[in-house]
């Protein structure tokens, strides 16, 4: 009798994706983040679903409904803390996943990579509209500042901003539609993640060496199911202490005050995972220029595959490219720090230099390093 998992129409898909999938034998822990992102998404959808049962998307009651969840709902405090800190874990895994893709040349699977960039943008959008929902001071002013950037678009900007707001400013209509967006987007993310996997399984996984691994494959189960399970345990070992012992350490104290359109916080800033892009936005004195730089900081990932000029796929055997990659990492950490600082010297000039270096590294230095390494590979005698 033929095994059911190999013949049943639904089981067959699961089998080919997670059980009998041929995987390279040498993929390292850096390949764990895909499954960790899947776990993060499931945690976010489940906790968000239960939070949505008790949340009210009205300007008068949104803030108090969140307080009610934390005080009166059974384990409401845990749901909220897991959801808020789960977002931080989600972005941490996302950044490491993208970093792995850049370091090991995974971006050469162009369809998988481009869907991944769209996923990154969608997750960022979801996190932004979600941050507005508690209707604290930073929620309100963050929404005001970021949506106001739309008005920088020539001709249609103001109309577009008012269309998003549902009025002449961020108000009840804005909050209601942001809640609707925040509810629907995770399911769109889930669909995109399936497409992401679909394209990945067309080519198979890349590996640290960048060499075609077809001659040395092992089944996904039990080897990588066990490895992914270990990754999941480690993820929870970070998330649970964070959510249970220090749930507010990554948030802004300003958000403990209800939204007040008449009082501006001394320093408006987004959550830590947006600070690098926020620093790039602020580094350009012109409003439209800042918006374009903000978009370019993420969309630049789309052209990374076309800037790959090296004959080798990964950075594993390319010391110059490795050095530039770690400079880029340090630069992004610097931008994250700058994004959280007030707009004054020396932070302004540091932010401008770090922003310029970010674009130069990706557009100029990394492709040149690839060409230089190609030249170094040629025999000189």
From Swiss-Prot:
Keywords, in A-Z order: Electron transport, Heme, Iron, Membrane, Metal-binding, Mitochondrion, Mitochondrion inner membrane, Respiratory chain, Transmembrane, Transmembrane helix, Transport, Ubiquinone
Cofactor note: Binds 2 heme b groups non-covalently.
Predominant location: mitochondrion
Gene Ontology CC terms: mitochondrial inner membrane; respiratory chain complex III
Membrane topology of the entry: Multi-pass membrane protein
Pfam families cross-referenced by the UniProt entry: Cytochrom_B_C, Cytochrome_B
Transmembrane segments: 33-53, 77-98, 113-133, 178-198, 226-246, 288-308, 320-340, 347-367
Tree of life domain: Eukaryota
UniProt-annotated binding residues for a ubiquinone: 201
Cofactor(s), by name: heme b
Complex formation: The cytochrome bc1 complex contains 11 subunits: 3 respiratory subunits (MT-CYB, CYC1 and UQCRFS1), 2 core proteins (UQCRC1 and UQCRC2) and 6 low-molecular weight proteins (UQCRH/QCR6, UQCRB/QCR7, UQCRQ/QCR8, UQCR10/QCR9, UQCR11/QCR10 and a cleavage product of UQCRFS1). This cytochrome bc1 complex then forms a dimer.
PANTHER family, per database record: CYTOCHROME B
Miscellaneous field: Heme 1 (or BL or b562) is low-potential and absorbs at about 562 nm, and heme 2 (or BH or b566) is high-potential and absorbs at about 566 nm.
Protein name: Cytochrome b
Gene: MT-CYB
């Amino acid at each position: 009798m033929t095994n059911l998992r190999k013949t049943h129409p639904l089981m067959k898909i699961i089998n080919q994706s997670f059980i009998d999938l041929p995987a390279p034998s040498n993929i390292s822990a850096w390949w764990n983040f895909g499954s960790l992102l899947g776990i993060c998404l499931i945690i976010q959808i489940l906790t968000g679903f239960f939070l949505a049962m008790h949340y009210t998307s009205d300007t008068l009651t949104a803030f108090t409904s969140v307080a009610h969840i934390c005080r009166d709902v059974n384990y409401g405090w845990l749901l909220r803390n897991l959801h808020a800190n789960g977002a931080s874990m989600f972005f941490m895994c996302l950044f490491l996943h993208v970093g792995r893709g850049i370091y090991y040349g995974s971006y050469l699977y162009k369809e998988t990579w481009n869907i991944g960039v769209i996923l990154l943008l969608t997750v960022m959008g979801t996190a932004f509209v979600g941050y507005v929902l508690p209707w604290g001071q930073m929620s309100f002013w963050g929404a005001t500042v970021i949506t106001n950037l739309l008005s920088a678009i020539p001709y249609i900007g103001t109309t577009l901003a008012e269309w998003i707001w549902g009025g002449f400013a961020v108000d009840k209509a804005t909050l209601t539609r942001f809640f609707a967006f925040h509810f629907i987007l995770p399911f769109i993310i889930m669909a995109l993640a399936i497409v992401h996997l679909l394209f990945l399984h067309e080519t198979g996984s890349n590996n640290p060496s960048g060499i075609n691994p077809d001659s040395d494959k092992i089944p996904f189960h039990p080897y990588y199911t066990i490895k992914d399970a270990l990754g999941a345990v480690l993820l929870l070992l970070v998330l649970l202490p964070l959510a249970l012992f220090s749930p507010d350490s990554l948030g802004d104290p300003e958000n403990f005050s209800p939204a007040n359109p008449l009082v501006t916080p001394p320093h408006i800033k987004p959550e830590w995972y947006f600070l690098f892009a926020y620093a790039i936005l602020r580094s350009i004195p012109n409003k439209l220029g800042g918006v374009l730089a903000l978009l370019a900081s993420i969309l630049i990932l789309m052209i990374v595959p076309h800037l790959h000029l090296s004959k080798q796929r990964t950075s594993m055997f390319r010391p110059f490219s490795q050095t530039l990659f770690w400079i880029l990492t340090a630069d992004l950490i610097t931008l994250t720090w700058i994004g959280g600082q007030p707009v004054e010297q020396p932070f302004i000039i540091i932010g401008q230099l770090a922003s310029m270096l970010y674009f130069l590294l990706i557009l100029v230095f990394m492709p040149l390093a690839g060409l230089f390494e190609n030249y170094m590979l040629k025999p000189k005698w």
